[in-house]
């Protein structure tokens, strides 16, 4: 028994004194001293601490933090010897859940209690459960960017911070619904207001504020965001996060599974907000026509949100049935993520045959587009000088598996081009296909996109892909093509009220156009979406965002093995992209479906990947930790294993196995 003394007061056993500080990491925190032995287990030490404090309260959330080892002592049956704790250990007895401020995708601030002792992935599951967001595996936390020091001390405007620190959910029990919202949000007017903030789109930002916010001016600037992601396999405490710190909550993985407006109002709204701010802050590029469509959708969504039309459709349109089918398949999956239809192998593979204009940019050439007879079968594109020569040898045959497919469209100018970057021994071979009209473009574009993923036009998703492309093009078409609704007047005079175009477009368009030039263009585009309900408009916005060429690419500065210069590595949901840093051109693409294995040498901070056909790629990370690249690859592979039949069941162990590293902390 610890603490046996002789008559003179000397200890005669193997006990020793252990000092424990009470509270969070604070040099001035009060402390108490316990008499323990190496055989004392953590549970017994916790009991002694509570007895010494002599204060009645709920201590169930408290645990011991070992400062030197950056470790929580959560195994209460382990002894001090097993942990390796000696008398010089700095131990803190404090709560495992502590308040943090989250900056949400809609840019609003929310204070809640997060776990500082569990791996971040598990903490995210709890946070998303509190916020009523399904599929927490798609989200993560970033460190807030450091604030620039200003020469003049400007008084920061006061910001409303919503508070959920007093809301506690019972573990293992699905939150009940009450009055159309999760029951824990209906406890008070404050929590109810918080739910409305989460589930309803925010009004357009102040144009002056929008111009002052930092925006990336180059591809290099876009890499800075991705250096701030927290490690999913370590807890907040291990990563230096303190109580009261501000963190950003964002969708990290651009693979959105089973997006349902009925069950996902918060997830849908926050995803829309992240897409909206990506466009407004120029994190992703779009054309002038596309920006007008995005502005019109924002204007329409804001009108419905302000009028209180949250769930009821603003009109009906039989033509939306096919679009709804396309939207239901918006999840982006890796190849092989689900078994292919058995009937696919029994049917004949559809072909595309048509006249297209083709252009192959080469150095020192002035030749433009030339018309050819083009045949597209399975994943192979062949083109001939004329239709009569088709049975013979083609001018060129291209296998599109693993290629980059980039749209180059101007609807008002009747320009429907497809840019293909096809892998070749010399790098990426560039070729342009010019289509005659929207229908031809949609068929060929859908075929190219599927072929790039190794799938053919016999795939069940081909028709929905064609419809989704046509739907996006129809939004860019000028004139009232959407069919009106009596509840939403179509005329510019009736719709212009409250429209400030500068809050709906990126700053580069603010500089290019005056407000009186933007307003009629936005209202004209609005006629194509005026019949949509709020959730339909948000889904259409997300779909249009997903159609952009640069959608879903996270950028990191790396240096490839054997190279003397830095380059950009783009990480998408199904591929890695090598990009020239100086000009932004794609140099090479590697598909995850062709990847055999990857590993990280934590000592030299190098990622090595092996692909089929004995292709080996190795690089060191410059702008971010190689852990971030490792986690992206493992995370996307994990997301590809999700199946609709399993519902919301989440294999946390598999995620941590695929994304967790062995980095020496």
Swiss-Prot record:
Gene Ontology molecular functions: integrin binding
GO CC aspect terms: cell projection; cell-substrate junction; podosome
Matching SMART domains: B41, PH
Domain FERM: 229-556
Chief site of localization: other
Annotated positions of the Phosphotyrosine modification: 11, 502
Alphabetized UniProt keyword annotations: Cell adhesion, Cell junction, Cell projection, Phosphoprotein
Biological-process GO terms, alphabetical: cell-matrix adhesion; integrin activation; integrin-mediated signaling pathway; leukocyte cell-cell adhesion; platelet aggregation; positive regulation of cell migration; regulation of cell-cell adhesion mediated by integrin; substrate adhesion-dependent cell spreading
Phosphothreonine modified-residue sites: 589
Domain PH: 354-453
UniProt entry tagged with the keyword Phosphoprotein: yes
Subcellular location: Cell projection, Podosome
Record's subunit section: Interacts with ITGB1, ITGB2 and ITGB3 (via cytoplasmic tails).
Domain remarks: The FERM domain is not correctly detected by PROSITE or Pfam techniques because it contains the insertion of a PH domain.
Family: Belongs to the kindlin family.
Annotated function: Plays a central role in cell adhesion in hematopoietic cells. Acts by activating the integrin beta-1-3 (ITGB1, ITGB2 and ITGB3). Required for integrin-mediated platelet adhesion and leukocyte adhesion to endothelial cells. Required for activation of integrin beta-2 (ITGB2) in polymorphonuclear granulocytes (PMNs).
Protein name: Fermitin family homolog 3
């Amino acid at each position: 028994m610890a603490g046996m003394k002789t008559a003179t007061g000397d200890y005669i056993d193997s006990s020793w004194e252990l000092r424990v500080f009470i509270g969070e990491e604070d040099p001035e925190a009060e402390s108490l001293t316990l008499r323990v032995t190496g055989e004392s287990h953590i549970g017994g030490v916790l009991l002694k601490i509570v007895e010494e404090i002599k204060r009645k309260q709920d201590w169930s959330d408290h645990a011991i933090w070992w400062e030197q080892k950056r470790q929580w002592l959560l195994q209460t049956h382990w002894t001090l010897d097993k942990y390796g704790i000696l008398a010089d250990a700095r131990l803190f007895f404090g709560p495992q859940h502590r308040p943090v401020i989250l900056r949400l995708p809609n840019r609003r601030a929310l204070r809640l209690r997060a776990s500082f002792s569990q791996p971040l992935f598990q903490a995210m599951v709890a946070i998303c459960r509190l916020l009523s967001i399904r599929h927490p595996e798609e989200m993560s936390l970033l460190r807030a960017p450091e604030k620039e020091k200003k020469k003049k001390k400007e008084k920061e405007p006061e910001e409303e911070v919503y508070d959920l620190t007093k809301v506690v959910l019972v573990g293992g029990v699905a939150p009940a619904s009450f009055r159309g919202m999760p029951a824990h949000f209906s406890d008070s007017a404050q929590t109810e207001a918080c739910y409305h903030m989460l589930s309803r789109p925010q009004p357009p930002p102040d144009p002056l504020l929008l111009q002052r916010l930092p925006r990336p001016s180059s591809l290099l600037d876009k890499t800075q965001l991705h250096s701030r992601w927290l490690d999913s396999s370590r807890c907040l405490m291990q990563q230096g996060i303190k109580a009261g710190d501000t963190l950003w909550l964002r969708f990290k993985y651009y693979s959105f599974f089973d997006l349902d407006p009925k069950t996902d109002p918060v997830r849908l709204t926050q995803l829309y907000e992240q897409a909206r701010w990506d466009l407004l802050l120029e994190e992703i590029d779009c054309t002038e026509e596309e920006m007008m469509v995005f502005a019109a959708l924002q204007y329409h969504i804001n009108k419905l949100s302000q009028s209180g039309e949250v769930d009821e459709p603003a009109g009906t349109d039989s033509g939306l049935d096919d679009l709804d089918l396309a939207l239901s398949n918006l999840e982006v999956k890796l190849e092989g993520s689900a078994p292919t239809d058995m009937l696919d192998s029994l049917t004949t593979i559809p072909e595309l045959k048509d006249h297209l204009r083709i252009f192959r940019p080469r150095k020192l050439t002035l030749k433009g587009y030339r018309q050819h007879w083009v045949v597209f079968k399975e994943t192979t594109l062949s083109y001939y000088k004329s239709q009569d020569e088709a049975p013979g040898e083609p001018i060129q045959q291209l296998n599109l598996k693993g290629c980059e497919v980039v749209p180059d469209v101007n609807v008002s100018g009747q320009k429907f081009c497809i840019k293909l970057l096809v892998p070749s021994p010399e790098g990426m071979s560039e070729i342009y296909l010019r289509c005659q009209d929207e229908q031809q473009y949609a068929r060929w574009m859908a075929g190219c996109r599927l072929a790039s993923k190794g799938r053919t036009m016999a795939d069940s998703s081909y028709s929905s892909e064609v419809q989704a492309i046509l739907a996006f093009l129809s939004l860019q078409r000028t004139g009232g093509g959407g069919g009106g609704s009596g509840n939403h007047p179509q005329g510019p005079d009736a719709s212009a009220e409250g429209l400030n175009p500068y809050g709906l477009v990126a700053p580069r368009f603010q500089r290019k156009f005056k407000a009186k030039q933007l307003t009629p263009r936005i209202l004209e585009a609005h006629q194509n979406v005026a019949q949509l309900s709020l959730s339909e408009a948000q889904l259409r916005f997300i779909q249009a965002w997903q159609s952009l060429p640069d959608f879903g690419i996270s950028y990191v500065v790396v240096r490839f093995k054997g190279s003397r210069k830095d380059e950009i590595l783009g990480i998408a949901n199904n591929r890695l992209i090598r990009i020239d840093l100086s000009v932004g051109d794609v140099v090479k693409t590697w598909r995850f479906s062709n990847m055999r294995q990857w590993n990280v040498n934590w000592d030299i901070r190098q990622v090595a990947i092996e692909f089929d056909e004995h292709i080996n790629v190795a690089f060191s990370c410059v702008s971010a930790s190689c852990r971030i690249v490792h986690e992206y690859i493992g995370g996307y592979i994990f997301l590809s294993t999700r199946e609709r039949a399993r519902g919301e069941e989440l294999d946390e162990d598999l995620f941590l196995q695929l994304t967790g590293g062995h980095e020496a902390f």
